[in-house]
Amino acid sequence: MVKAVVVLSSSEGVSGTVQFTQEGSGPTTVTGNVSGLRPGLHGFHVHALGDTTNGCMSTGPHFNPAGKEHGAPEDETRHAGDLGNITVGDDGTATFTIIDSQIPLTGPNSIVGRAVVVHADPDDLGRGGHELSKATGNAGGRVACGVIGLQG
């Protein structure tokens, strides 16, 4: 089993930890707990770069090795990094589990060394009709991020 972790941070008081586990060539299980967000849905994506020198802005676009349009996690046409939304409760906390087959922890399309980004707004899953829907899900600003690192 391969394990990875990201510690999310921000200048806006958002924090959290996200764990990734993958058994063999099976899907990757993502479990997380994020706090300090406003209640509601927030876009949750793997971005292409693990560069946080300019905060979350330098993490690049969504991880998209196949060159597809943005979509929902269950869509055939989607960026590999499109993990949809996390749901934040009235207490400002989101606890979630996602199982996804397009974010491996090993191999040429590994997400290790890339960044996880939590966005300010809901991801419209490419269906919102906004000019940014097919690129970013119109999920708004980047409120927290961190680099995915291997765990022992």
From Swiss-Prot:
InterPro entries: SOD-like_Cu/Zn_dom_sf, SOD_Cu/Zn_/chaperone, SOD_Cu/Zn_BS, SOD_Cu_Zn_dom. Pfam families: Sod_Cu (PF00080). Its cofactor is Cu cation; Zn(2+). Zn(2+) binds at residues 62, 70, 79, 82. Its main location: cytoplasm. GO terms for cellular component: cytoplasm. It catalyses: 2 superoxide + 2 H(+) = H2O2 + O2. Binds 1 copper ion per subunit. Its EC number is 1.15.1.1. Disulfide bonds join 56-145. It is found in: Cytoplasm. Cu cation binds at residues 45, 47, 62, 119. One of its GO terms (molecular function) is copper ion binding. Keywords: Antioxidant, Copper, Cytoplasm, Disulfide bond, Metal-binding, Oxidoreductase, Zinc. The keyword Cytoplasm applies. The keyword Ribonucleoprotein does not apply. It is an enzyme of class 1 (oxidoreductase). Homodimer. PANTHER family: SUPEROXIDE DISMUTASE CU-ZN -RELATED (PTHR10003). Destroys radicals which are normally produced within the cells and which are toxic to biological systems. Belongs to the Cu-Zn superoxide dismutase family. This is Superoxide dismutase [Cu-Zn] 1.
